């Protein structure tokens, strides 16, 4: 039986965490068939900045095979996005050209490369109640064992200890299991943006006056 360990992320975890991001990058399912031309495309947005800017809020799940999950947090979303804009995104834009041609014909990778040049920093209101945000992904072999809940609870505990009043996260409208998972953890729907494969449900949870366990 596999033994799993939850620990703080280290710089050398980046490649493994990027792999997890890609393998869960098809609305929670395996994204490898769509990102073979650039397997790290998603990870550069949804993993790398957290490991760099919020190492104390970045947890890694690993087993004897390697990294199989992560839970990431940002204490102040607006400050995090400011650092992403000024410190992280310029490097992406310099390395990856903005795609041209008809966007309807772009590959998944081209769409992500376009996000490098045209990021979305949407923060649902009321911001003051949910200034922090979270992101989590687990490979299939690590799912259904309670690790997702434990990791999110640990990150939320860290946020609460630092004084955050609440945290939010975004869920694809096509990822119904994830919506149910977060609802069981006490997250409630804040707002829906877009529709279909481009739609996102933002959910929030108060961290005031309670343990998240």
Regions found by a protein language model. Give the residues of each.
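Conserved catalytic-core motifs of GNAT/GCN5-like acyltransferases
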Residues: 78, 170, 183, 188-203
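Conserved beta-strand in the GNAT
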Residues: 60, 66-75
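Conserved active-site alpha-helix within GNAT-family acetyltransferase domains
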Residues: 129, 134, 145, 149-150, ...
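Active-site rim helix/loop that mediates acceptor-substrate recognition in acyltransferases
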Residues: 26, 35-58, 64
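A conserved short alpha-helix in the GNAT/GCN5 acetyltransferase fold that borders
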Residues: 143, 152-160
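Conserved GNAT acetyl-CoA-binding A-motif
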Residues: 130, 159-172
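Conserved acyl-donor/pantetheine-binding loop and adjacent beta-alpha core of acyl/acetyltransferases
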Residues: 78-135
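Conserved N-terminal entry element of GNAT/NAT acetyltransferase domains
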Residues: 1-12, 209-213
